Curated annotation (Swiss-Prot):
Its cofactor is a divalent metal cation. One of its GO terms (biological process) is NAD metabolic process. The lineage of its organism: Bacteria, Bacillati, Mycoplasmatota, Mycoplasmoidales, Mycoplasmoidaceae. It catalyses: NAD(+) + ATP = ADP + NADP(+) + H(+). The keyword Ligase does not apply. It holds the Pfam family NAD_kinase. This is NAD kinase. It comes from Mycoplasmoides gallisepticum (strain R(low / passage 15 / clone 2)) (Mycoplasma gallisepticum). The keyword Transferase applies. Disulfide bonds: none annotated. Keywords: ATP-binding, Cytoplasm, Kinase, NAD, NADP, Nucleotide-binding, Transferase. Belongs to the NAD kinase family.
Length: 274
């Protein structure tokens, strides 16, 4: 039974949880099993903004979307693999029955997000920001206010350590292991010829680095102008004559730490090799 907020306040000793599940068949089949296990130790509430724990049952896409949406201090977020990819998940169908007993033993940490500011708007991403266009476009790139290069191509990808196994990997970026505190920038399809070239390599920057991207061209068809995609969702389109500022920031919520080398390597092997 889901308890209302006022009912929970009468039972302050009980830790509370809210469960989010994707609509994937695997996720739907796991949902009743997860609730049965969680109800052994926690009280379910109908409002995620008052829960002590947020459980996300699905793949990495479901996890990322809701981790950004519900990020707040005091919340612990735990992923359960009810989808396909599960780099952010701690439990799956083989060990759901161990969730309740392991809650107090789990190690938690804050995650690195990427903060992007354009005009007066601020956005956050857990995996990456993808600045791209359908045609080659010019960008002036600055690193900590030092001019880095003039880039012309279809876009730039800026990712976190945890996001390095996502689109970043598909774009030939490096996979960063969990204990590496960094952000990574990858060029997307640079335009190269005898009078114009770029570094053409991913760069891995210290976590406190600030990146500034200046788009100076103010002429293009709206559909061909650069757009900004945050973790797969388009947040701005038709960019011209503007400046984008990017830096890392810490999440407010706590997540299960994934610093164990062996388990991370096994996850890489299972996902990309075997």
């Amino acid at each position: 039974m889901i308890m209302k907020v006022h009912q929970v306040q009468e039972k302050k000793m009980n830790k509370t949880y809210y469960l989010i599940s994707s609509l994937a068949p695997k996720s739907e089949s796991l949902k009743p099993l997860i609730k049965k296990e969680l109800n052994k130790k926690l009280v379910e509430v109908d409002d995620p903004t008052v829960a002590d724990y947020l459980f996300i049952n699905g793949g990495d896409g479901t996890f990322i979307k809701n981790a950004i949406k519900y990020d707040r201090a005091g919340l612990k977020i735990i992923g359960i693999n009810g989808g396909s990819l599960g780099f952010y998940t701690t439990f799956n169908e083989t060990n759901i029955d161990q969730i309740a007993n392991n809650l107090d033993q789990l190690k938690y940490t804050q995650l690195d997000f990427i903060r992007l500011q354009i005009d007066d708007q601020i956005h956050h991403a857990l995996n990456e920001f993808n600045i791209n266009s359908t045609t080659a476009y010019g960008y002036d790139i600055f690193i900590d206010n030092e001019f880095y290069q003039k880039f012309r191509g279809t876009g730039l990808l800026i990712s976190t350590t945890t996001g390095s196994t996502g689109i970043n990997k598909s774009a030939n970026g490096a996979i960063l292991f969990p204990r590496i505190k960094a952000i990574q920038m990858v060029e997307l399809y640079p335009l190269l010829h005898s009078s114009f070239t770029t570094i053409q390599s991913p760069i891995i920057l210290p976590i406190d680095t600030k990146i500034r991207i200046e788009i100076k061209e103010n002429y293009c068809d709206h559909d061909a102008c650069p757009r900004i995609v945050a973790d797969g969702a388009v947040i701005r389109q038709g960019l011209s004559s503007t400046t984008i500022e990017i830096s890392a920031t810490r999440s407010q919520a706590d997540y299960v730490a994934t610093t164990d080398l062996r388990s991370y390597i096994q996850r890489l092997q299972k996902t990309f090799i075997y």
